[in-house]
């Protein structure tokens, strides 16, 4: 478990920490009884290095699973190119056994799959059909615009793989094939997580006549304010810039594609801390952001805790943070490049992914009512005042405002 479950070792099983397949089947059954649909996270740009495919792939150069992954010869004792990983450091890992490098755009324990291989693609499609046969209602496709790479693997400017591994040359071919092989004529929802996607590309992915996806998660509004050290460097931005981005996507996909609307997810800081005010105007700014989200055209996505106004957390010790992105960025920027500890910690407080990953705050009992045991990461200390129980019977609460917003959105769309 190197990246909180995004390093998958078995596509047809449930991660131990979350229970068993029997538990999942019961969850699906009970949700469907209540007219709640379940969308699965589909992570098929990469697997875990503990997946049986990769274990076989690294055994020898002529193994039948070798071409399930991206293996390349080095250049003069160096990696095949200068691409950097999303999680800091090089995107290539040397394998002593076969004396070649494998590509990992994320952690070295997350080797990239080789979508150029039709046999690999068919394995993916079979797995997707298996989940649909179980009755799941759709897929959120993790970094799905990374699956097609420029097969020349050229160097990127300052190690940036984006122009060569995002929205690549065969991406539309692969998604159309997936639609035909798996998704066609089924009542499903499909949303692609797509860092770096433009409005023009968004229309190609979600257009009515395109036969690819229902909608995409774009990141443009999430990347606003990035500075010299990316998101770890707090930079001021104008409200008009945020409005410009949101308007661009609203107008750009109108009458053709479809927007997914979100402020929060497991990779982003808490919206009331990021774009609102988590102190004096906590209640009002959280409601303002909810109004903005629900009054745009598209499908709103609400992340756990957003509906009660959960805020960012500021743990004093680096050791209290669990996210591989945070820990690797600290190693790269502070230990190797000399950025100050204080500056980096402020960046973590502002934009770190663990802000979104502290346990849900149900009530004011120990650990926010999340568990009687020891939570995997500390609870935000403000759970005493910000929790579901505190808000559920308060008509003026953020929670009840979200409920009313959802009802209003449903009425408008019916």
Residues covered by each model-derived region:
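Active-site and adjacent substrate-binding regions of carbohydrate-active enzymes
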Residues: 1-410, 414
